[in-house]
Amino acid sequence: MLFRSAEAAGVDAIVAEGFEAGGHNGREETTTLCLIPAVRAVTSLPLIAAGGIATGEAILAMRALGAEGVQVGTRFALTEESSASEVFKEYCLHLKEGDTRLLLKKLSPVRLARGNFQQAVAAAEAVGATEEDLRILLSKGRAKRGIFEGDLEEGELEIGQASALLNEKGIQTVAEVMDELVTGYHRACETLAANVCERWDV
């Protein structure tokens, strides 16, 4: 694992990101749920979980798996303060489960939302596109066009699977998101303490 090299180099903490995350990703398709305990088992460094984390409940789950903290991307990418296009934000807030896919594994794996570009990449890969073919497909500033200019037709729409959890949220401020995450985390802690542990006689 790459984290071993990072640990040897003297880093202060490790960020372990599951393939639920938006944007560039690992080729292994390891979920955050499986990745965090695997990394926790072999390092004593502070561990920051990432990928698919958009609620307070998810934060508690990561803590239970051994992470000291979390990295949240999709939630904050869709806030008022984000520099992403408003068109991109609104589009992502209407995505459903299964609307994002991990593609471009021959180059640099990236999770993309449904749209013309995602379809074009999937079609190219299905017929055996070479690395050079894929580079040509990517060579038109696609990410900037999609995320920052709001080009939903030809742009690269990078966002995580957690977007499907945000359909009823609308565009929120960072403060509102933080309040929800903290409140949700504490509520989940209380629920776990009051119900699960007692029910399972732990």
Language-model segments: which ranges?
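Short, small-residue-biased leader/transition segments that mark boundaries at the very start
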Residues: 1-2
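Acidic (Asp/Glu)-rich catalytic clusters
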Residues: 7-10
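Non-cysteine beta-strand/loop elements that form the S-adenosyl-L-methionine
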Residues: 12-18
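Short, ordered loop/turn segments at secondary-structure junctions
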Residues: 18-20, 75
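Conserved active-site-proximal phosphate/metal-binding subdomains
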Residues: 26-48, 54-202
